[in-house]
Amino acid sequence: MLELPGMTTRRFFVYIPRQGAPVAITHAIEQGPWAGWPAKWTKEKYSSWRLLESLLADVVKGKRIAMEYSPGDAVPYLDRVPAGVLEMVRNAGATVVSSADLVSLFYAVWSDEQRASHERAARAVATIGQQAIRLAGSRADSASPLTEYALQSWIRERFEAGGLETDHGPIVAIGPNAANPHYEPAAEKSATINRGDILLVDLWAREKNGVFADQTWMGSLGPPSDRDKTIWLAVRDGRDAAISLLQQRISAREPVRGGEVDDAARAVITKRGYGDFFIHRTGHSIDPRDLHGSGPHIDNLETREERALIPGVGFSIEPGVYLAGDVGMRSEVNGFIGADKVLITPTDYQKDLLVV
C-alpha cells in the first residue's frame, strides 16, 4: 500500500495509530524511498538491530496491533508477515491481531466508478464468451474446426479490439481438458473442438485501470447427453443457491460470511452426488487491483474464510464438477455487495448449456 519508489532491501516498520500521526522506522541507508513521507509525521532511522528493536518497543509496547497474519494460516492470502517478525513485535510488548477485516475495508472495497467499470467489462466479457462458443460450433462441421488455442487467441483479439486488457488466459477446454480447472491450451499442445464436445470457456478482462470481470460459460456442440445435463444442473443450481443466500442475507441487512456462501453451493452439489468432484473453493475475492484479490473469498473448503462480505466488496461465484479424464463443467458469475442488495454480473447469466 505504501508503493515506495526505488530499492528497499532493509527492514522497515510503519505504525498507523487509530488516532494521531503515523510513525515509520526506516534504515539509514534507504532514506530515498521515504522522501515523500510527510514531514509532520514521525520518521525514525536505525542502522543496528539493537536500535531497531529499541525503537520498535518505544512505538508498540502495550498496544494492540493489527498485522497481515492469519491465525493458524486459516486464510493464507492474509498470512504475509514472517513468523520471526511476529515474534519480534510481540517481544516488543505488543498484542498482535489479524488485520483481515481492515484489509477488506481499506483495500478490497470498490468505488462507484470501479463498480461501473466492472459492469461495462462484464457486459463485454459475456458477449465475447458466448460468441466464442457459437464460433466453435459453426466451425465444428467445417474442413477447419478450431483448436482450443485458436479460440483462445480469437478471444484475446476481441479483448484488444474492445479496449480490454487481461493478464493471461483465457481457459478454453473441451472434455478431459476441462476436468483440469486450471488447464490452458498452448500452441504446441491443443485439442481440436469437434461436434459432440462439451466446451468450457473461462475468460476475464478489465478496462484499463478498471476492475476485472471474470466469467465461465459452458457450451455443448450438439445435444448434450443426459449425464452431461445432470452435471450442468448440479453446477448451475449450486451457483444459484449461493446467489440466493446472498440475496436473502443482504436484503435483510444480515451478515453473511464467505464460508457460508461456499457451504450453500457445496451442499447442493453434494446432494446431487458430485461433492467429491467439486475440488476447489466456490469463489475468490476480486478487489480494485487484482483479479484474485485480498478481500473475503467464497471458501470453506480450501481455507476457513470467516470474514463478512461487507458493502463494497466483489468476488466470483464459480462452482464446478470435474470428472478426471472425462469432463469438467463450471459456471462463473461475479457478485458485488451493495448496501441492501447484491449485484450479480453479468445480469443475464447462464441458465442452460449453450447448445450450438
Please state what every model-predicted region is.
Residues 1-356:
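Active-site neighborhoods and metal-handling regions in enzymes and metal-associated proteins
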